[in-house]
Amino acid sequence: MRRRWLILLTLCVACRAPATDDPRLVSTMVRAWYGVARVERLSPPVTSRVLAYHAVALFAGLTASDSGRALAGRLQDFPTLPAPEGTVDGTLAAVAAVRVVSEGLLAEALPTTRSALARLADSLVTARVATLGWRGGGAALRARSEAHGAAMGRAILDWARADGFSATRGRPYAPPVGADRWVNDAPASVYATQKTSGASESVQLDDPANTLRPGSTSDRALVLSRPKGADRRTLPAVNMAGASEPYWGTLRPFALARWDACPVVSPPAYATTPGSALRTAAEHVVATQRGLTEAQRATALYWADNAGESGTPAGHWAAIASATAAARGLTAPAAAGVVLATSIAVADALIAAWGYKYRDVTIRPRTYIRRVIDPRWEPAIPTPPFPEHPAGHATQSAAAAAVLAARLGDVPFVDSTSLALGHPPRRYPSFTAAAEEAAVSRLYGGIHFPTGNDAGRALGVCVGRTVAARGIGGIA
């Protein structure tokens, strides 16, 4: 009899014990966001903003019982999140919060994107309810959790709408003119659109990259032919013809006190005489391209993360963070915290980098080299539509690596993010080594001077360490 009562007691305790949030929720969300950035042809800055706010919503939901204390005081102007009215389930709250943020930030996304995200959210809720069963408290817990998550999502969305992004939409920009200034002179042929069927516009969020790359894709193509323009006010596609996001540096940073809180080394002064700093840097680019090995070319393509072909570098590093957290066996809240810290670091890195880019409006290697050294010279990969200094890839990669090293240690890892794009997995001895390879890949591609890469790395390290010091994404 006593044994029977012990068994019954054990069963009752088990039925009341809260179900642990499944860490796979985090990786599922990150894959979805990567797919959205790709099919919507988002630029790196816009992708970083979308990912960062979604990551905030995911983390807030998974730490809902904390009443927002894990985020309070760590993000600029972050609102006080509503307190839960009773016990809530983290997964249900997270899905609800992310759903609200998605519906707000992605209101101008393609219909197929919006419907795919809605189906994903519905499937996650259905799976969670099945996991909870009668142990979860039934309909009341679900309703309470989803209501609380939606309330958090609305608070986060209101916070996002006050970051200055909307003020930059439609704002005219005329770049300064001068021999030392950037001009968007990449030939139109490298931006040739690809013809795709209507069926390929459907995003398969469980493996988005696999369905979006047509068989005839060229590694030089940047833009997929999709019915979406760069003039959207809330979710613009990348603008290849003009200056991409010239006012991005005016956005409110997430962790930095100001966009220029981390200093950057100024670019070399414009000069064409042999032996001058800029001429020497340009000759280094030419020599690197002339002796480019297949391995170096593969590295340039691996880290290109072009808009329209990938989730951009922001999605790439979020995927690295998610995969590494999963390999470590982190809990769902802890994994979401790692993704959040990484996404915030990348977002702030791009606000800082773009602020400096459009402050200095530095000439690109293609323009300088064709004018001064070789009029027929072309880089290995297309030149992006924004100024050179500092290098954006170097900045955001160094920022992400600094945060990941602070949170997880500067440890070896395997990156399989671009497997579906035709790139085999790469093994790295550390996050720092991966970031350094991402930076030098832009030299291999012929689109950055070494000075731009060096400045970007230093800037990114400063941003990443600032984010890490604020404890963003940490849990008690």
Identify what each model region corresponds to.
Residues 18-476:
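Acidic/polar surface patches and capping/hinge elements
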